[in-house]
Amino acid sequence: MSTQEHKTFWPLMKDCITAEDKTAMIEFIQNAGRFTNGPMVKKFEQEWSKWLGCKHSLFVSSGSTANLLLVAAIKEKYNLKEGDKVIVPAITWVTNISPIMQLGLQPIFCDVDPVTFSFNTNHLKTLAAAHHDIKAIFISHLFGISADVDAYKAILGPKVTFIEDVCESHGATY
């Protein structure tokens, strides 16, 4: 029997900032009257919305901020209360879980598929059977791979609110 270790390396990203990008950023910093909510941000939001085929886009300082605003908006719109249960992936970014905890909701961790890093549907079924009071599920579409949202809806039913983080899957289709 071989004791040879098998290591797989998955690069998360490559440096894609060109010299031209750096020059443009330096010029912007030197000449801009303001760094946030300026005309370039508005233009980018409009172009991004058009590319996505949606009505509005809102750009914020980070993915952490985006997730906090997203969960806060969902909590208010769907009247989630302190202690309400939200299913989250057991392997994900901390910024998918921290806003749930910051806003007083209870994360329920679901195992993930080792290939897609999306929810393991067998474990999701187990959680749905054990917790009849689940209010939401926070889905992360990782590495450009769209999660099987239809399967999750079939398991959880129409009363569960779906929250989706697609920061790693812009342009992916399902």
Stretches with model-predicted labels:
Residues 25-26, 48, 66, 86, ...:
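Generic structural signal for small/hydrophobic residues in well-ordered secondary structure
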Residues 115-174:
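Active-site phosphate-binding strand-loop segment of PLP-dependent enzymes
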Residues 1-81, 102:
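Conserved PLP-binding active-site segment in aminotransferase class I/II-type PLP enzymes
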Residues 62, 91, 142:
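Flexible loop residues that form catalytic
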